[in-house]
Amino acid sequence: MFQATLHPPRRRLLLAVALAVGVSMGSALAQPAEVPDPGPALPYIVGLHEAYLTPQYWAARAEHADTPLLLPAQIAAQNTRMRSRDPSIQDIARLPRQVPAAQLRQDITALSVWPTRPLYGADGQPVPAATRAGIEANLALASLPAQTRPQYGLVVQRAALRTFPTRQRVFSRPGDTDIDRFQESALFPGDKVAVVHRSADGQWLFVHSERYSAWIPYEAVAIGERDTVLGYGAQGPYRVITGATAHTAHTPEEPRVSGLQLDMGVRLPVLADWPAEQPVNGQQAHAAWVVQLPVRDADGRLQLRPALLPRSQDTAADYLPLTPRLLLQQAYKFLGERYGWGHDYGTRDCSGFVSEIYRSFGVLLPRNTGAQADSPALDRRGFTDQDSARTREQAVAQLQVGDLVYIPGHVMMAIGQVDGRTWVIHDTAGGSWNGPDGRRIAAHLNGVSVTPLEPMMASDTLRYIDRITSIQRMRPPGTPQRTSQTP
């Protein structure tokens, strides 16, 4: 939120941005608006100016900022391709009625493999052998029945997906407390899962979801009838979370739906016919949306309960139109958020960041960077060691708003070009570039950041550009690259 009093340079900058946006919104087919002044240069990040930290600046520079990159029918077709062609996406509705023990063991051990490198605890000490033995025993692989009938459930709260059935945090080096190597991802309220195994201590469930299979705390899942689970949210109306996060209203009457965090792109069914005179969990509902959320009863069974989603929260009745302007708007809602490896810290990592942005437009992406980079369902431009530096630089110069740029283990979203540089927004733990003396500066960005792409260094000798593995575009297949840019 802006301060009540703004310094004159800041007022002038905001006025320039506002004027530029006002002009550009007049017509999607109008000539590009006069771009705002970039404002004062900021320290540390190479080439960064004040206005670069606003989505309005980049929207004013973008051609056809209000023209959809994909129409709803094209998004639906792309999602269909994703579900049919991408091996990382799984349809839990198509699981067999009985899963053989050999298949289940293979599914679990594909994930739950102890790393060969040393692991350290939060205290900086090596993980004891006894701790490892206890964690591996908790997999309960020896007790797998000959056949397992999947159960179906809905996630009732934001919950971690873990490599092993444990809350033990482990790290690759002493002193690191951010990159927990057992943290895989997270699931959100209303996500659908198939439960196929339980840990020896009974506290963890091995689940399949559409984009990931991993261990989740048992208290985060409500088990229900298959058809009820798979049919949840199939009919509108809806509210789609369009803010970085939203929260349900606090309610002591029903703690199970009180203050729940809902992340960008989550879509919840609305109980549109809720009687106006009937309070919801002790509160009259005119200032909120009455949404339906899953909860657990005392036996862990699924119940569906009303909850209030205040109208002050950033939501929409449907997925947003996939335009460059709105892509920028959605990405910048995360600006400055702390980096959370595997959705740790209640936040997200680089691939989670772009997934949640595109989810608010109804676009399905794989969970991890490797799967996203290789997905055959998108408009992919791949790179190999045979591609020259010039070829890579030309591809970077042609990036458009929303294009996703992949290097090993990382993804960035293009936001525009200015002064011969391509700029990206990305959720990053690190980042580095060469200083005036030619030495590499290792930055601890550790959050959603805006940086130029060209100066970013992967090592002392390799640029990010040299390590690009692919560029994924949200365009109808076969759409040619546009090379013209706003000056």
What is each of the regions a protein language model found here?
Residues 177-180, 252-255, 313-318, 336-345, ...:
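Second-shell loop/turn segments in exported
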Residues 33-51, 211, 219-240, 245-249, ...:
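Aromatic- and glycine-rich peptidoglycan recognition patches
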Residues 32-162, 168-171, 176-178, 194, ...:
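Boundary regions of SH3-family modules and the immediately adjacent low-complexity/disordered segments
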